[in-house]
From Swiss-Prot:
One of its GO terms (cellular component) is mitochondrion. Coiled coil: none annotated. Present with 2400 molecules/cell in log phase SD medium. The keyword Flavoprotein applies. The keyword Flavoprotein applies. The gene is CIR1. InterPro entries: ET-Flavoprotein_bsu_CS (IPR000049), ETF_a/b_N (IPR014730), ETF_b (IPR012255), ETF_beta_N (IPR033948), Rossmann-like_a/b/a_fold (IPR014729). This is Probable electron transfer flavoprotein subunit beta. The electron transfer flavoprotein serves as a specific electron acceptor for several dehydrogenases, including five acyl-CoA dehydrogenases, glutaryl-CoA and sarcosine dehydrogenase. It transfers the electrons to the main mitochondrial respiratory chain via ETF-ubiquinone oxidoreductase (ETF dehydrogenase). Heterodimer of an alpha and a beta subunit. Interacts with YFH1.
Length: 261
């Protein structure tokens, strides 16, 4: 293992509407209703957090630090506290100053600055956020850093030669790739199952400090103004319930009614 680098892992996390909540379009038809709705960590990011902690637990001498960062409102402190309770070393909250829907490219640019500031050499992040499903922030970050990337990771291994082997899921099965650090890895659902955190650890995490940054003050060179505008949004049309048919003749009659035949 002499060829292995000390790992400084960065894990970006996002606060999103809880995955168990059915999203509803707001009254202005410009987005999702967020008032009175439960929020939690993006499930794919939670998997990235778990993987970072597991890597540290398996390779204590290999991991120098694990750091989680969230870009959003002050309310994102809750998910960062959860990260600390699970075992992440330190956290940063980058206040978006009222800008809730920062686009992926701007997020990637901010994360690039964080990587450079923290000296990170491995970024573990969810392959996508469940609110916008963009699935491109990790790729953009890797491009900006000029680092290799492994997306949709289902397994991550550190080889004795210092390289990282990632098994990723593709349409036809699995693909195994290798790369050298530094690199960006985006996580898929099958990578692991995040651990449950008990109340004592959550209470203890509340006493830990969270670094507070401000987009306007600490990243003034990055334009966070949206390049796209949501013109309108609507919920999918409700499908009519299915009908149980007892014979082929009934099926034919129903098809004739809807003029399918």
């Amino acid at each position: 293992m002499s060829a292995k680098q000390q790992l400084r892992i960065l894990v970006p996390v996002k606060r999103v509407v809880d995955f168990q909540i059915k999203p509803r379009v707001n009254k202005t038809l410009t987005g999702i209703e967020t008032s009175g709705i439960k929020f939690s960590i993006n499930p794919f990011d939670d998997i990235a957090v778990e993987e970072a902690i597991r890597i540290k637990e398996k390779n204590k001498s290999l991991v120098e630090s694990t750091h989680a960062v969230s870009i959003g409102s002050a309310k994102a402190q809750d998910i960062l506290r959860n990260c600390l309770a699970k075992g992440i070393d330190t956290c940063s909250l980058i206040d978006s100053v009222g800008k809730e829907n920062i686009e992926p490219l701007a997020i990637a640019k901010i994360l690039k600055a964080v990587v450079e500031k923290k000296g990170s050499n491995l970024v573990l992040m969810g392959k996508q956020a469940i609110d916008d499903d963009c699935n491109n922030t990790g790729q953009m970050l890797a491009g900006l850093l000029n680092w290799p990337q492994a997306t949709n990771a289902a397994k991550v291994e550190f080889l004795d030669n210092g390289r990282v082997q990632v098994t990723r899921e593709i349409d036809d099965g699995e693909e195994v790739i290798e790369a050298s650090l530094p690199m960006v890895i985006t996580t898929d659902l099958r990578l692991n199952t995040p651990r449950y955190v008990g109340l004592p650890k959550l209470m203890k995490a509340k006493k830990k400090p969270i670094e507070k940054l401000d987009i306007a003050k600490d990243f003034p060179e990055i334009n966070i103004e949206p390049q796209l505008k949501i013109v309108s949004m609507e919920e999918p049309k409700t499908k009519s319930p299915g009908v149980k048919l007892n014979s082929v003749d009934e099926l034919i009659e129903k098809l004739k009614e809807v003029k399918a035949i």
